[in-house]
Amino acid sequence: MTQPEARSTLPADYESQLRESHLRPLWMANVSAVMRAEPGQPLRRAQPHMWHWREVRERLLRAGELVDVAQAERRVLILINPGHTSPDGVSADSSLFVGAQLVLPGEVTSRHRHSAAATRFVVEGSSAVTVVNGERLAMEPGDLILTPPHHWHEHVNEGTEHVIWLDMLDAPISSHLDAVYFEGSPRTPVSEQLPERQAYRAPGLVPYRSPSATPLRYPMLRYRWADVQKALEALASSADRAQAVHLMYANPETGASVLEPYGYSARLLRPSEEVAPMLTSASAVYHVVSGQGESEVGGRTFSWEQGDVIAVPSQTKVRHRNGSASRAAYLLQVDNAPLQSKLGWYREFA
């Protein structure tokens, strides 16, 4: 949908009075066109786009040579959607901050907490740990690590290899709502994983408790890729070929998303398989965990390989195809469907 050009027919002195009073005519504002947008034809800034991991990785490693982690706080390159032209535009799609972070051997990032909800998806390296509220969490490639709002966290690389992961935060949302805060703190003693979290390792089972007891709000902070891949492969081997292999990361106590306001899920594409997810009002970001293939997003075709990141704007048709005839491909999907659902905005289109 093309936004109509607003033309002023108002007297100059009246326009001046409106500006002085910090008022604006609705019929002259961009919001007027937005309110007339038709379903399936939204006015949106985000564009279909793909970040090639080989480029991101090369530039991130270069940053490791140029920037000390003590100087940078976090050595992160932000993935910015080309549709966001303002200096403060930091979204990979319409609402999700995605950044690639590098931690070199021996580095320790400063301990802090903030209002934004954050996750880390490990791309390279196995020698780092994330410490959340004093609890030590191992990080292996493909693992999803949660750092919920208001939780203290830091990262430590204890090995001899660099570690890279994707940071994913709701910072664009909290920033827009003026709900951002950040607080630093000295390091504190670190403990191993809380014993009660071990009880959540078996699917469909949670610790027995009195009906009056309150469960952990975030019972799992680390979702191991080894477990996710095993579950995807089990579904692929038993499901009908017509059924897509798609599993959601869920809070075992509630069945809801592991960390709202976003939904996290993993897809397995069978050899040569092609899938066309339902067209919805949600925007999404895909990360290629492994494999190679192509995705058609809003009429554009992106050929992808391991590590690449793809932005799918709201109400945009998408189709994925596994380019291998012998090996499965795996995709991580992060979308804002839970947020839209909470606000009553979410829609599905035939």
Language model: regions and residue ranges:
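A short beta-strand-loop-beta hairpin characteristic of the jelly-roll/cupin
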Residues: L104, V108-P141, T147-H151, M278-Q306, ...
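C-terminal structured domain segments across diverse proteins
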Residues: E253-G255, Y262, M278-S281, G291, ...
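Contiguous mid-protein beta-loop-alpha structural module that forms a pocket-lining wall or clamp
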Residues: I145-R201
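Asparagine-centered strand-capping/turn motif at beta-strand->loop junctions
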Residues: V156-N157, R321-S324
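A short hydrophobic beta-strand segment most commonly corresponding to one strand
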Residues: T119-F121, L146, T160-A179, A325-R347
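A short, N-terminal "cap"/entry segment at the start of jelly-roll beta-barrel domains
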Residues: T2-S94, E183-G184, V190-P261, S265, ...
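Intrinsic, low-complexity N-terminal interaction/targeting segments
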Residues: V76, P87-V90, F97, T109, ...
